[in-house]
Swiss-Prot record:
This is Inorganic pyrophosphatase. Its main location: cytoplasm. The lineage of its organism: Bacteria, Pseudomonadati, Pseudomonadota, Gammaproteobacteria, Enterobacterales. Transmembrane segments: none annotated. Mg(2+) 2 binds at residue 71. Its cofactor is Mg(2+).
Length: 179
């Protein structure tokens, strides 16, 4: 399986593909797809005992300000397997900083055609529950707590327009850097 050939989406910035590295409720293991080979590697075992609150992955052919592909979080009714590609629509962005600098995470819902009635009315970040936002914030504020010299801080939740801008900026950055 070569994930390098997966496009960023059908129609950027509002119809995108998420490549899932870590399913919802996964154990505290950080997986990352090696961008050169497309192979899923164990990045590290996270010492903080926490579960991922939603599917975690990235948007291919993007580079965020931290030098990695743009992160994406996809809440779904069930965990999505490692290495799966899921068509999504962005609904917002979680802005953070960590020991490496600015870190944005796109929040996206599965494309309407995939939902068969689940959550099909969620179009913007304010449409997801406060509980879901709190769970995501709590996870990302604390998952590095037991790792030396690592830290995170949630700055803000922003709307779908900010998410679309972040996606286009990251896509254009990748094209400009030609990497």
């Amino acid at each position: 399986m070569n994930l390098n050939s997966v496009p960023a989406g059908e129609k950027l910035p509002n119809d995108i593909y998420a490549i899932i590295e870590i399913p919802t409720n996964s154990n505290p293991i950080k997986y990352e797809v090696d961008k050169k080979t497309g192979i899923l590697f164990v990045n590290r075992f996270i010492p903080t005992s926490m579960f991922y609150p939603c599917n975690y992955g990235y948007i291919n052919h993007t580079i965020s300000l931290d030098g990695d592909p743009l992160d994406i979080l996809v809440p779904t009714p069930y965990p999505v397997l490692h290495g799966s590609v899921i068509r999504c629509n962005p609904i917002g962005v979680l802005k953070m900083i960590d020991e490496s600098g600015e870190d944005a995470k796109i929040i996206a819902m599965p494309h309407q055609k995939l939902l068969a009635g689940y959550n099909n009315n969620i179009k913007n970040i304010d449409d997801i529950s406060n509980l879901m936002k709190s769970q995501i914030s709590h996870f990302f504020e604390h998952y590095k707590d037991l790792e030396k010299k690592k830290w995170t801080k949630v700055i803000s939740w922003e709307d779908v327009k900010s998410a679309e801008k972040e996606i286009l900026s990251s896509f254009n950055r990748k094209k400009t850097l030609n990497i």
